[in-house]
Amino acid sequence: MAHRIVTQVVVTGARVFGRAFAEAYKQASAASKYQQKTGKSAGGSSSSGITLDEACKILNVKPPQAGETNLEQVMERFKKLFDLNDPQKGGSFYLQSKILRARERIEAEVREAERKAAHEKELKEGWKPKVYKDR
């Protein structure tokens, strides 16, 4: 009689575990397909989880136009807001981190635009090696 109860417990547990595993696999598969469509990875991205528009609103600056922005103004606003939200002065660490991420996002956008511009310039000019020593 005891072996029958033990067998039922094992079979029921295996069935529950199997269903849970199948459901978890379905959810992971759906999440993977969604990430592939949106182009985002679980490990994070260069956007550091904040959009450029949100970063500009946090620091109250204009979005970079063609990769150009006034970085002095961005740093000025960053320092002011970062110091105002110092936790030792009664500010919020959460707001400080949001301000830091906003500055990093804008700087990353400008760096990426500068890198692309330099790459385009190099492609436009072309690579002109000196083949002969006398020329």
Swiss-Prot record:
Record keywords, A-Z: Membrane, Mitochondrion, Mitochondrion inner membrane, Protein transport, Translocation, Transport
Domain of life: Eukaryota
Sample GO molecular function, one term: protein domain specific binding
Compartments, record wording: Mitochondrion inner membrane
Renumbered residue ranges of the record's region Disordered: 30-49, 114-135
Keyword Transport: yes
Compositional bias (Low complexity): 39-49
GO cellular component: PAM complex, Tim23 associated import motor; TIM23 mitochondrial import inner membrane translocase complex
Keyword Hydrolase in annotation: no
InterPro entries, per the entry: J_dom_sf, Tim16
Described purpose of this protein according to its UniProt entry: Essential component of the PAM complex, a complex required for the translocation of transit peptide-containing proteins from the inner membrane into the mitochondrial matrix in an ATP-dependent manner. In the complex, it is required to regulate activity of mtHSP70 (SSC1/sscA) via its interaction with PAM18/TIM14. May act by positioning PAM18/pamR in juxtaposition to mtHSP70 at the translocon to maximize ATPase stimulation.
Domain notes: The J-like region, although related to the J domain does not stimulate ATPase activity of mtHSP70. It nevertheless mediates the heterodimerization with the J domain of PAM18 and is therefore essential for PAM complex function.
Annotated family: Belongs to the TIM16/PAM16 family.
Identification of the protein by name: Mitochondrial import inner membrane translocase subunit tim16
Source organism: Emericella nidulans (strain FGSC A4 / ATCC 38163 / CBS 112.46 / NRRL 194 / M139) (Aspergillus nidulans)
Phylogenetic classification of the source organism: Eukaryota, Fungi, Dikarya, Ascomycota, Pezizomycotina
Gene: pam16
